Design a protein with these regions (language model features):
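Active-site glycine-rich loop that binds ribose-phosphate moieties when present
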Residues: 119-139
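Charged helix-capping and loop-helix junction motifs
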Residues: 159-166
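C-terminal functional extensions of proteins
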Residues: 189-251
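Short connector loops at secondary-structure junctions
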Residues: 179-191
Length: 251
């Protein structure tokens, strides 16, 4: 399962579920019901078509196909014309340390509903990873680099943690724009606020800018330009409006 990649792919294919923010719109749950019929708790809520994505991808990976090639093939099959690049073809697993030990991210986030206090975050395998083909070049040759308002610690953090990618983003000739996921001192969803605080950062746009460090410290007193815009996006119209506002602000 590659949750962030799948969300991007489903969104660009026009099949994403707008109510949940993940999965496929109108998906059914016969597989989950079948699992429950055997007395097993189907706590990881994946729809039938979403299961198909994971089954096909797992099969192709077991056949030796690299993740980047698998994603390109699957995105193409869904009619997505844009390139979707994973950060790496290597296996990297997000691990969360809580009071009773280390958990896989989905065990923490979904299984325990991210209720535990996060003591640490680690990315198992990150030190052995290499950027997937085309990722560094995409950063270095881009006209504009957006770091979207995902969780800085567990969504953007592992991408920048792949050896060479933080440097590539910092060396990009294009402007680098970091969008803060913090609104009014809190995250709109998920555990981003608590994770920022655990890492010693202020839960604010300033704290997000501080976390991204040399990439685009977007607070005036850090020496870079700050743009204040409406970042709460409830539907497609809001997203189009926000993208247009950012482009207009950048000139």
């Amino acid at each position: 399962i590659s949750p962030d990649v799948d969300t991007v792919m489903y969104t660009l294919a026009g099949v994403a579920n707008p109510e949940t923010g993940w999965g496929i719109a109108g998906d059914t749950r016969a597989t989950l019901d079948g699992i429950a019929a055997y007395g097993v708790d189907p706590w990881f809520l994946v729809g039938d078509r979403d299961f198909a994505t994971h089954i096909v991808r797992t099969d192709l990976l077991r056949q030796g196909e690299p993740l980047s090639a698998v994603i390109a093939s699957m995105a193409g099959a869904l009619g997505v014309g844009m390139r979707i690049l994973p950060m790496t073809d290597a296996t990297v697993r997000t691990m969360i340390r809580v009071e009773d030990g280390w958990l896989g991210f989905q065990d923490y986030f979904v299984g325990r509903r991210h209720a535990d206090t996060v003591l640490d975050v680690a990315f198992d395998g990150i030190d052995r990873a290499h950027p997937a083909p085309g990722v560094k070049e995409a950063l270095l040759e881009a006209d504009l680099v957006f770091i979207c308002p995902s969780n800085p610690i567990v969504s953007i953090g592992p991408i920048l943690g792949v050896p060479g990618l933080h440097e590539a983003a910092a060396e990009a000739k294009a402007p680098v724009v970091c969008i803060s996921p913090i609104v009014g001192g809190r995250a709109l969803k998920g555990p981003a606020a608590g994770m920022l605080a655990q890492k010693g950062h202020e839960v604010s746009a300033y704290g997000v800018a501080e976390f991204y460090g040399g990439l685009a410290p977007a607070i005036e007193r850090l020496g870079k330009r700050v743009i204040v815009l409406q970042t709460v996006m409830g539907d497609r119209g809001d997203r189009v409006r926000f993208a247009s506002d950012v482009m207009a602000a950048l000139g």
